[in-house]
Each structure stands twice: as structure tokens, then as C-alpha cells.
Amino acid sequence: MPLAAYGVTHQGRRSTNEDSWLVDLDLGLLVVADGMGGHNAGEVASALAVQVIRDVFAGSGDIPREALLIHAVQSANERILTAAAEQPAHSGMGTTVVAVVVVDDRAFYTSVGDSRVYLWRGGRLTQLTRDDSWLAETLDGAGEQPQDIGTHPMRHVLTKVVGLRPELDATVSECALAAGDALLLCSDGVHGAVPHELLASMLASQKAVEDVAQNVVRSAMNRGATDNVTAIVARVAR
């Protein structure tokens, strides 16, 4: 089904931008990666992840695209580990990855880290992915939660990233798409600064996806985002 998509990134209040993103409508592929690591290693890791994922899909031949997501992310994991071993200054680098591939009327998606995919449909915004973070696991847990959970020093710690260790457990989920649906892929610079309700109202706009994506990033900046800020907005034609 016809899909329009557009991505925007901004370094925010950081000296460098360690986010990378990809919109490839020929492949139906959308990716956001938020890198981490010293000596500019974060931007190396995120750029490698995006490039490897795209290369896997571009060279897939007749393999169904929905079957490639896990292989693509695991290939990115291996490439980042190799690059870190070859360059000591990049040791310990890693990145989040959230990737969506649209095939006919379905979206297949995977996420590692705390970058997210949201689905907007009929006035409602739903977070499709679950953060791989201490905070998310604590909130989902059955035990007693710390009273200071909102300010806890562990709240931003990720439990899974691409490039951290050789074994990477990634899963693929899917959802049906309908005319008028919108997808938002974003780094934590967006969802950490912009309230869910405001994201929903911006995605409800009938403006072009370029304008909506720019508005999302601008809103994060206006609300004091301290991290790099990246958003991809995709919309299924009515």
C-alpha cells in the first residue's frame, strides 16, 4: 500500500549527533539508531548499524523481507563488535536499533534498546515496542518498586544494545496497517521530552509527513531535550 515517510534529526544540546536514521521506501525500510560510546564511537556504531541493515535488505534477493529483520540486526551487532575490536578508541561502542519493514498491508518491527515505534490510528497513539531498560523492567516487575523510580540513577540504564556482546536476542512483531495509519520511529531524545498526548496530537495532523516529523523534533527541542533528537514519520495513504 502507498507509504510516505520522512526523517529528521538534530544534535540537540550535544556537541555531536550520535543518532542515525534511514528511510528507504523502495525497500519499505525505516530505521532509527541511537549510538553510545566515547571518542565519537556512538555515531560510528549507529551509522554502521543503519548501513548494515540496509545492505542486508538490499542484497536479500528473493528472501521475504519480513524474514530478514533479525538477521539484519544480528549482522549489525557482529559488524559493530568487529569494528570495536579493530579500533581500540571505539571499544565499548554500541547503539539502539528500531527497525520497521512494511510489506503490503503489514508492518514488521524489531527493537533493541530504548528507541521506539508508535502506531497512530483513529485518534489513538500506541507504543508498539518495549524499552530494553532498567526502568521498563522495574515497572513491569512484580516486586516492590523504588519510591524514587522517576529520579533513580538507574532509570536510563539499558539492558540490551546492539554491539554490547556477541549474543543478541532480538524478536520480530507485526501489526496490520490500514489507510490513514501513521508510524513514528524515534530516539529517546523525542519520547523523553515530548508527552505521549502531544505526540498523538501531532501525528493526528493531516500535514505532510515532512512537516509532522519536523514538528516532532522541534517540539522536543522546545521542551528542553538534552539528547540527540531523531524522528521518522510514515503514513499510509488514505
Region locations from a protein language model:
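PP2C/PPM-type serine/threonine phosphatase catalytic domain
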Residues: 1-238
